[in-house]
Amino acid sequence: MTGLHQLISLLHLASPALPIGGFSYSQGLEAAIECGSVHDAPTAERWIGDNLRHVQAQCEAPLWLLLHRHWQAGDAVRVRSWNDWFHATRETSELRLETEQMGWSLARLIAQMEWGTPALRETLAALSPVCLPTAFTAACVALEIGARDGLAAYCFNWAENQVAAAIKAVPLGQVAGQHMLRRLHGAVLDTVDEACRRAEATPPQLSTFSPMLGLLCARHETQYSRLFRS
């Protein structure tokens, strides 16, 4: 597959139009708005950037790289192990539901689009639940998308969904959201670099320590008025 074909496949996979429901989740951002921690564009940008650098970069992003590596190697045992590990690290019912629902939707799409080999699709179908990073890395391997490029798209898509949530819930203007997303490019690149460092370590350096995020996600479960499912 040529570089241009890979780029188009990556744009397809990271598109907000992909029918996996990412727009319906805020991952604690809505609770941060409710309690006043996020109340304008600068605080929203700081929240999203800090989440990228200090939460995603320490756990989900390096785990994403490990999953991509094991899908490429055809190592179904390690894929299942890391999928189950990631599911166990989701601290609240909403975060678990989010990764389960989006992972299931993407796995179903992979099957319907017949991406990848039959063996890859069978391994993915056998996972229950299947988490979003597991399904996304399977799609990247199926479409011959490299690890760094795929992770950058995954992190940018995450940031894009967060900015869209901030636009709706703070609320912010569309242009303010685009300025914010542009300034977050550096945080996305930092996240990819840190994830590569952590994934290459022996053993991999993964950390799930994000107590404030866990508390806010738990509070969101009983929040009176909500736009988002997490």
UniProtKB/Swiss-Prot annotation:
This is Urease accessory protein UreF. Keywords: Chaperone, Cytoplasm, Nickel insertion. Gene3D superfamilies: Urease accessory protein UreF. It is found in: Cytoplasm. It comes from Cupriavidus taiwanensis (strain DSM 17343 / BCRC 17206 / CCUG 44338 / CIP 107171 / LMG 19424 / R1). The keyword Ubl conjugation does not apply. UreD, UreF and UreG form a complex that acts as a GTP-hydrolysis-dependent molecular chaperone, activating the urease apoprotein by helping to assemble the nickel containing metallocenter of UreC. The UreE protein probably delivers the nickel. PANTHER family: UREASE ACCESSORY PROTEIN F.
